[in-house]
C-alpha cells in the first residue's frame, strides 16, 4: 500500500508506478532505514507519542527485520513496494500490527531518505578509506622491494631523467593520500543528522534533535530544515572525490599498461590479472589495468549527472532527487572495485631490473647532470643548456651516449668539461644528486618509505 493514497480517487497507473518506484535500487538503504527508524522510535517516546513498552516492541521487530535483511537483502526485490521506506513500514506492520503505523508520526520520507543516504555514505567512506590504505600499503611494500631498480622517468612520454621504480610507487602513495584526506574531509561535513526536519519546515514535535543525532552516531543535528531535506552536497562531494581518485588510478593503470608492453618490458603482470586472445595464442593482455582505465568515465559521468540534477532545483525536496542514488551506488562500487583491483595487480608484479636499467641508460636522461656540471664550472645555465643540447645532437649523430664521448669530443662544445665529468654522468650519480626532500635519491626514497610505513601502521 502506498504511504500517500488518501488524497487520490484513482489508482496509480502501472506505467507510472514502474517509472516512479525506486525499490529496485534504494533497497540498498534497508539497513540504514531500519536503524534510523529505531532511533526515531526512541525519539517519539520523549514526546509521548509512544510508550516505553510500545517502543520496545517496535525496536524488537525492527531488529528482527534487520537480521532478515542482512541475511538476504535481495529478497526485498521480490516485493511490490514503492520504495525502501514503504517496504520497511509494511514489514513492520506485518510484524506488530497497527502499532507499526505510529512510527512515521512527525517524520517525512524527505528527512528519512536524507538520513538514510547520509548514513550509507558515512559507512562507504569508512570502507573506501580502508581500501585506499591497503593500496597505499601495497605500493609502499612494492617500493621497498624495488628501491634500487633504476628506470627512466618521463615527461611527454619521452625519457627525461633517471628515477627508481620505488620513487614511481611512492608518487602514487602521495596521490592516494590526498584521496584519503578528501574522504576524511567529506565525512566531517556529512556528519550532521537531518532526521527531524520533516518534509521541509521541521517536525511539529518537540524532539531533541541533538540527542537524536547523537543516538544515530552523528556529530550534530543539521541547523536548517529546508536545507536538510534539499542537501545532496555529500553525494556530489563523494562523486567528485571518486572521480579524482579514479583519474589517479587511471594514470596508474596507464603506466602499468605501458610498462607491461613489449616495447617497454619493464614489468610482467601476473597471469591472475591478465587474459588471452581468442585468436592469437601468444597474447597476454593487461585487462585488469585496461578496465580500471576504462571505468573512469562511468564515475565522472555520475558526478556530471548529479550536478545537472541539482543545478536548477528550487527548495526544498523534488522528485528529481531520487536520481541521486543509482549514480552514487554505482560510482562508489566501481571506485572501490578499482582500488581493490589495483592492489591485486601489484601482488605478483615482476619488475625487470635489467630492462629498466637498459632503458634508463638510453635517451640521454643524464643531460641535465651535464648542464648542472657546467653551471658548477661557472657557465651560466642558459649557456650550459644550449651547450648540452648541441652535445646531445652530436652524440645522437655518432650513436653514442654522453658518458661514451671522449674529452676531445666534449671540447668541441665546451673546454670547461674535464675528466671528472664521467663520474657525474653515471646513473647512480644522477640519482644521488637529487637529494632534496621529495627527490629521487635512494636516501630520500628510503626515508619516504620508512615514514609511510610508520604512518600506515
Swiss-Prot record:
Family listed: Belongs to the lyase 1 family. Argininosuccinate lyase subfamily.
EC number: 4.3.2.1
Pfam families linked to this entry: ASL_C2, Lyase_1
Organism name: Histophilus somni (strain 2336)
Keywords: Amino-acid biosynthesis, Arginine biosynthesis, Cytoplasm, Lyase
Reaction equation(s) it catalyzes: 2-(N(omega)-L-arginino)succinate = fumarate + L-arginine
Name used for this protein in its record: Argininosuccinate lyase
One annotated GO biological process: arginine biosynthetic process via ornithine
Enzyme class: lyase
Family matches, as InterPro entries: Arg_succ_lyase_C (IPR029419), Argininosuccinate_lyase (IPR009049), Fumarase/histidase_N (IPR024083), Fumarate_lyase_CS (IPR020557), Fumarate_lyase_fam (IPR000362), Fumarate_lyase_N (IPR022761), L-Aspartase-like (IPR008948)
GO function terms (MF aspect): argininosuccinate lyase activity
Cellular compartments annotated: Cytoplasm
Cellular component annotations (GO), alphabetically ordered: cytosol
Pathway the protein acts in: Amino-acid biosynthesis; L-arginine biosynthesis; L-arginine from L-ornithine and carbamoyl phosphate: step 3/3
UniProt xrefs under SUPFAM superfamilies: L-aspartase-like
Residues spanning the membrane: none
Amino acid at each position: 500500500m502506498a504511504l500517500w493514497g488518501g488524497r487520490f480517487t484513482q489508482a496509480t497507473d502501472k506505467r507510472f508506478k514502474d517509472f516512479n518506484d525506486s525499490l529496485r535500487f534504494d533497497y540498498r538503504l534497508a539497513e540504514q532505514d531500519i536503524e534510523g527508524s529505531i532511533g526515531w522510535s526512541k525519539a517519539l517516546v520523549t514526546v509521548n507519542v509512544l510508550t516505553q513498552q510500545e517502543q520496545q516492541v517496535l525496536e524488537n521487530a525492527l531488529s528482527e527485520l534487520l537480521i532478515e535483511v542482512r541475511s538476504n537483502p535481495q529478497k526485498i526485490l521480490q516485493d511490490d513496494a514503492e520504495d525502501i521506506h514503504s517496504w520497511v513500514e509494511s514489514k513492520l506492520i506485518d510484524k506488530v500490527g497497527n502499532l507499526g503505523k505510529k512510527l512515521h508520526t512527525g517524520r517525512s520520507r524527505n528527512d528519512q531518505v536524507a538520513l538514510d543516504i547520509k548514513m550509507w555514505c558515512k559507512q562507504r567512506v569508512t570502507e573506501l578509506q580502508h581500501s585506499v590504505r591497503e593500496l597505499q600499503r601495497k605500493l609502499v611494500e612494492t617500493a621497498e622491494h624495488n628501491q634500487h631498480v633504476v628506470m627512466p622517468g618521463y615527461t611527454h612520454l619521452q625519457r627525461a631523467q633517471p628515477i627508481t621504480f620505488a620513487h614511481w610507487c611512492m608518487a602514487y602513495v602521495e596521490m592516494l593520500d590526498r584521496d584519503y584526506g578528501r574522504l576524511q574531509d567529506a565525512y566531517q561535513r556529512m556528519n550532521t543528522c537531518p532526521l527531524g526536519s520533516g518534509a521541509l519546515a521541521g517536525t511539529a514535535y518537540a524532539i531533541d534533535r541533538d540527542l537524536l543525532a547523537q543516538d544515530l552516531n552523528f556529530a550534530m543535528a543539521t541547523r536548517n530544515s529546508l536545507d536538510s531535506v534539499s542537501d545532496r552536497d555529500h553525494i556530489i562531494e563523494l562523486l567528485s572525490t571518486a572521480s579524482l581518485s579514479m583519474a589517479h588510478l587511471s594514470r596508474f593503470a596507464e603506466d602499468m599498461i605501458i610498462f607491461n608492453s613489449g616495447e617497454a618490458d619493464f614489468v610482467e603482470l601476473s597471469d591472475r590479472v591478465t587474459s588471452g586472445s581468442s585468436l592469437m595464442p601468444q597474447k597476454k593482455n593487461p585487462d585488469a589495468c585496461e578496465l580500471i582505465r576504462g571505468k573512469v568515465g562511468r564515475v565522472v559521468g555520475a558526478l556530471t549527472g548529479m550536478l545537472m540534477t541539482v543545478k536548477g532545483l528550487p527548495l526544498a525536496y523534488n522528485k528529481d532527487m531520487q536520481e541521486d542514488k543509482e549514480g552514487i551506488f554505482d560510482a562508489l562500487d566501481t571506485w572501490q572495485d578499482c582500488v581493490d583491483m589495483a592492489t591485486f595487480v601489484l601482488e605478483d608484479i615482476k619488475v625487470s631490473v635489467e630492462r629498466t636499467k637498459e632503458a634508463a641508460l638510453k635517451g640521454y636522461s643524464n643531460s641535465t647532470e651535464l648542464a648542472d656540471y657546467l653551471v658548477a664550472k661557472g657557465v651560466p645555465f642558459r649557456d650550459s643548456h644550449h651547450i648540452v643540447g648541441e652535445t646531445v645532437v652530436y652524440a645522437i649523430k655518432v650513436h653514442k651516449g654522453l658518458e661514451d664521448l671522449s674529452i676531445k669530443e666534449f671540447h668541441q662544445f665546451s673546454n670547461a668539461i674535464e675528466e671528472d665529468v664521467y663520474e657525474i654522468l653515471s646513473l647512480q650519480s644522477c640519482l644521488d644528486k637529487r637529494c632534496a626532500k621529495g627527490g629521487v635519491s635512494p636516501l630520500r626514497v628510503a626515508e619516504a618509505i620508512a615514514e609511510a610505513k610508520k604512518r600506515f601502521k
